[in-house]
């Protein structure tokens, strides 16, 4: 399928690189509705920091155990912010926000790619960062069972480099093609003196749709259901503040070979985020899928419980899949504790599905047939939180 690039009166990609694509709208609409899959304190929040500790020039003791908070990102502070926002917008709580429209819900998600952009600037790899941008939002909205409809982007830079911007947009178009959604429009902002020369920032926004009778909200999950993990391509788009500190400690360059791997460190770290849309929607259509967790910031520890009803937790079997070489290198070089790894990175599993035992048997049989790769990574149990065996 070719990605559709649609035009509108306020923004059109026929004038793709026009700087003055700014839009402002004020609308009055019904109060949005959001299905809260769990307590709002479990809501994913991205917290970005540009502190000195986030930079590669920072020196630390090689014997210290690195962690995300010391790298400038405080997940707990993000959770506190969500609690405060929830007082003003009590409907939040899921991976995507739901808005009622007739017999369906529109499902919306927005995200960026974090400090992975810093590595894009260092490696010069710009043509896949747009795939990351699309993936972060569409992977969120499919957790409700929604089919992506359209995507919008925000590209901000100090001085517009048309060739560079073209590479970025090319990746966004490819991400939309993989997601089978339309690239509806976007905003290009040229902001002199705000960004360093040659640098830019990205944000994306995706909207999908799902029938009210088909929405996946986790309410039917019970103890004994099975967790199926879908493999990631690497770090995806979370945890790069910590990754960059590990890289600084290692004394390796992005052009050096990944220890234990088959590519350079730069290529391994910049591998685009997997877009799970087609695979997940196909599995949903076959039945038995009760919940979905996009494994982003917060890792397994924070994201999996978000789909459970109260009183349920999960047991993860860490030997169910092999930890990819990239994560082994990150943990060993940074002397990072297991608990920190599990709350920061996806560890090779980018999406977790909660399915009935019958659906699990079908999925694993399809894996044997070579249709795709998936792992039985755990089970739902009575209790709270996530334990590891």
Swiss-Prot record:
UniProt-annotated location(s): Plastid, Chloroplast
Recorded GO MF terms: ATP binding; copper ion binding; phosphoribosylformylglycinamidine cyclo-ligase activity
Protein's name according to its UniProt entry: Phosphoribosylformylglycinamidine cyclo-ligase, chloroplastic
Enzyme class (EC, first level): ligase
Keyword Ligase: yes
Leader sequence segment: none
Transit peptide: 1-58
Pfam families found in the cross-reference section: AIRS, AIRS_C
Segments of this protein annotated with the region Disordered: 46-65
Entries under HAMAP family matching the protein: AIRS
Pathway the protein contributes to: Purine metabolism; IMP biosynthesis via de novo pathway; 5-amino-1-(5-phospho-D-ribosyl)imidazole from N(2)-formyl-N(1)-(5-phospho-D-ribosyl)glycinamide: step 2/2
Ligase found in the keyword field: yes
Gene3D superfamilies, A to Z: PurM-like C-terminal domain, PurM-like, N-terminal domain
Organism the protein comes from: Arabidopsis thaliana (Mouse-ear cress)
UniProtKB keywords: ATP-binding, Chloroplast, Ligase, Nucleotide-binding, Plastid, Purine biosynthesis, Transit peptide
Membership in a protein family: Belongs to the AIR synthase family.
Gene Ontology annotations of biological process type: 'de novo' IMP biosynthetic process
Enzyme Commission code(s) on record: 6.3.3.1
Any one annotated GO CC term: chloroplast
Catalytic activity: 2-formamido-N(1)-(5-O-phospho-beta-D-ribosyl)acetamidine + ATP = 5-amino-1-(5-phospho-beta-D-ribosyl)imidazole + ADP + phosphate + H(+)
């Amino acid at each position: 399928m070719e990605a559709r690039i649609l035009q509108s009166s306020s923004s059109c990609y026929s004038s793709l690189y026009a700087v003055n694509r700014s839009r402002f709208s004020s609308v009055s609409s019904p109060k949005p509705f959001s299905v809260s899959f769990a307590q709002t304190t479990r809501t994913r929040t991205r917290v970005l920091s540009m502190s000195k500790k986030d930079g590669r020039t920072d020196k630390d003791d090689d014997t210290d155990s690195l962690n995300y908070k010391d790298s400038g990102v405080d997940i707990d502070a993000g959770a506190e912010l969500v609690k405060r926002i929830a007082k003003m917008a009590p409907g939040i709580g899921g991976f995507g926000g739901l808005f009622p429209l007739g017999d369906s819900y529109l499902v919306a998600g927005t995200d960026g790619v974090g400090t992975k952009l810093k590595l894009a600037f260092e490696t010069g790899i710009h043509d896949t960062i747009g795939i990351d941008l699309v993936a972060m939002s569409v992977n969120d909205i499919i957790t409700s069972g929604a089919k992506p409809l359209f995507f919008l982007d925000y590209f901000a830079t100090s001085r517009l480099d048309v060739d560079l911007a073209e590479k970025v947009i090319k990746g966004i178009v490819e991400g939309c093609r993989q997601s089978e959604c339309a690239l509806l429009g976007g905003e290009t902002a040229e902001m002199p003196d705000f960004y360093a020369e040659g640098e830019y920032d990205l944000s994306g926004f995706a909207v999908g749709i799902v029938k009210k009778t088909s929405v996946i909200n986790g309410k039917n999950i019970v103890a004994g259901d099975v967790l199926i993990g879908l493999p990631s391509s690497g770090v995806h788009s979370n945890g790069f503040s910590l990754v960059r500190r590990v890289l600084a400690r290692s004394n390796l360059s992005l052009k050096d070979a990944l220890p234990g791997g088959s590519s350079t460190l730069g290529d391994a770290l910049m591998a685009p985020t997997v877009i799970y849309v087609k695979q997940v929607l196909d599995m949903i259509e076959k039945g038995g899928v009760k919940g979905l967790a996009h494994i982003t910031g917060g890792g397994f520890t924070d994201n999996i419980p978000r789909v459970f009803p109260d009183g349920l937790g999960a047991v993860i079997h860490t030997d169910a899949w092999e930890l990819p070489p990239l994560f082994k290198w990150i943990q060993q070089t940074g002397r990072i504790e297991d608990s920190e790894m599990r709350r920061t990175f996806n560890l090779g599993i980018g999406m977790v599905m909660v399915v009935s035992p019958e659906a699990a048997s079908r999925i694993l049989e399809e894996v044997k047939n070579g249709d795709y790769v998936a792992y039985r990574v755990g089970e739902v149990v009575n209790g709270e939180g996530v334990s590891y065996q």
